[in-house]
Amino acid sequence: MARNGWASGGRGEAVTGVSLVGMKSLEAIEGYIDEIGPNARFELSYQMSAEFLAQAAPLIRGRVVSAHACCPSTEFFPNLASADPSVVAQSLTDMETTLETALGFGAGIVVLHAGYVTDLAMPSSYAARKPILSRPEFLNDVRHADGAICGPEYRASPGYIPYAERAKERLVALARRYARAGVRLAVENLNPRVGYLFHSPEEMLELAALDPDLWLCLDVGHLYITSFAFGFDYLEGLKTIIGSGKVASCHLHANSSEPGRYRDDHSSLKEQGFPLEEVLKIVAASRANLIVEAVEDLAGNTRIVQKAAAGREIL
């Protein structure tokens, strides 16, 4: 296995932290810091408004290890796959703002959803995004109606390929821009929904090989869903992606998915049926940052991950 020698952005060893996506108030942040103590570390969330970011700054500055684009929050997610120049231009502008945010907070990594199988701007609000993802051009590729889940053949479809190729080309250029500023751009594997790009271990390996400056964010919950939808061994899929040596950060959360059921719950790592011990053993050995992205029991989940990172029993 290749080793990732500067997982926390060139600023020291890999760390355990938590995404601020699960914290909606200053009180929640303060409570988490009180529970975890001086080792509390954070990933800025794409849901943080400029106002909330400014309010939270005194609490979290010096504790931020990564940011999730776009931050502060924007009306649309970046869509580097679009053939519409105006959509791409706005995406790059928003990514430049996110880079400024990361630098301002001392974050060494920015996590990105690379793009979508459409030329349209993709709303960051799920309520606004869902009608776009339900458009007729996506219906032929839906294998499981509940969740609009695709199959493994989707990545080879004529509708998918040109969007993936455009996204790859722009990711390389953007990663090099970020690297010049001392920040690593990490592309996240998404859940296997029609309209989303980059779900499978094979695609993540392709991204990892594109350029030395392009990194990965391994979302273990998303890959869990994909393993059921695509029919591959989940733990082997994790090992495949980790084995690239390019995983800068891991998003850690569980869900209630199973064969025929696909749920991106972002629930506690102790979700019944989720292979927690095996997952944490694999990711803890990677030296990637370990970021809890659950939306419940954040301190409890952080302590579980801290134990795993230290090689201690977690249950």
Where are these regions (language model features)?
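Active-site mouth loops of central-metabolism enzymes
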Residues: E13-E27, N79-L92, S157-E165
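Active-site acidic/histidine proton-transfer and metal-coordination neighborhood
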Residues: V87-W215
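Short, glycine/acidic-enriched loop or turn micro-motifs at the edges of active sites
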Residues: C71, N191-P192, H222, E296
